[in-house]
Amino acid sequence: MALITTGNGLIRDLEKFGSVGVYVPLEGGFEGRYRRRLRAAGYTTLQFTARGLGDVAAYLTGVHGVRPPHLGKKSSGNGAAVGNVYYLPPIVGSQLEHLPPKSKGLVLWIIEGHILSDQEVEFLTSLPSLEPRVKVVVERGGDRTFRWKALKDTFSASYQAV
């Protein structure tokens, strides 16, 4: 890999496909460089982990309920013993509302994406067609060098056969 990477190939493929699956070296550091390149190209990035997402479609595009960690404490009311449900606005919608005026769009950078099911990855693949200002980068695994391909090409072989 070159010492100085411009990231133009990733940006070009992200604009072409709308969503890409990346394979990053396990020692890390590369995602920060590429996120910086995306911000320099005019995108706003939002990074979060795939662990604990639950329903990806509801989390990103719909109002969804969350419960804070109960830390061993129980509520004494008639509700659930693990605490109240707090409803949060859709992440994508609220982030798009607050984009700077000259921004090209929002890039969702999802780390630990290897734990996502193929149905969840399929939704993430279709998300840029539902909202054209949203691009998706999912870390699908590790590799010796930083590489990427279209997210639809990262489905498991058993899912592609269906």
Swiss-Prot record:
- Cell compartment(s), UniProt: Cellular thylakoid membrane
**Has keyword Flavoprotein?**
no
Pfam families given in the database record: NdhN
Q: What superkingdom does the record give?
A: Bacteria
Q: Which reaction does it catalyse?
A: a plastoquinone + NADH + (n+1) H(+)(in) = a plastoquinol + NAD(+) + n H(+)(out); a plastoquinone + NADPH + (n+1) H(+)(in) = a plastoquinol + NADP(+) + n H(+)(out)
* Keywords assigned by UniProt, alphabetized: Membrane, NAD, NADP, Plastoquinone, Quinone, Thylakoid, Translocase, Transport
On whether Transmembrane is a keyword of this UniProt record, the answer is no
Topology relative to the membrane: Peripheral membrane protein
GO molecular function per UniProt: oxidoreductase activity, acting on NAD(P)H, quinone or similar compound as acceptor; quinone binding
Q: What is its EC number?
A: 7.1.1.-
> What cellular-component terms does GO give this entry?
plasma membrane-derived thylakoid membrane
The UniProt function text for this chain reads: NDH-1 shuttles electrons from an unknown electron donor, via FMN and iron-sulfur (Fe-S) centers, to quinones in the respiratory and/or the photosynthetic chain. The immediate electron acceptor for the enzyme in this species is believed to be plastoquinone. Couples the redox reaction to proton translocation, and thus conserves the redox energy in a proton gradient. Cyanobacterial NDH-1 also plays a role in inorganic carbon-concentration.
Q: How does it assemble?
A: NDH-1 can be composed of about 15 different subunits; different subcomplexes with different compositions have been identified which probably have different functions.
Q: Which HAMAP family match?
A: NDH1_NDH1N
Stated family: Belongs to the complex I NdhN subunit family.
What is this protein identified as?
NAD(P)H-quinone oxidoreductase subunit N
Write down the species: Nostoc sp. (strain PCC 7120 / SAG 25.82 / UTEX 2576)
- Protein encoded by which gene: ndhN
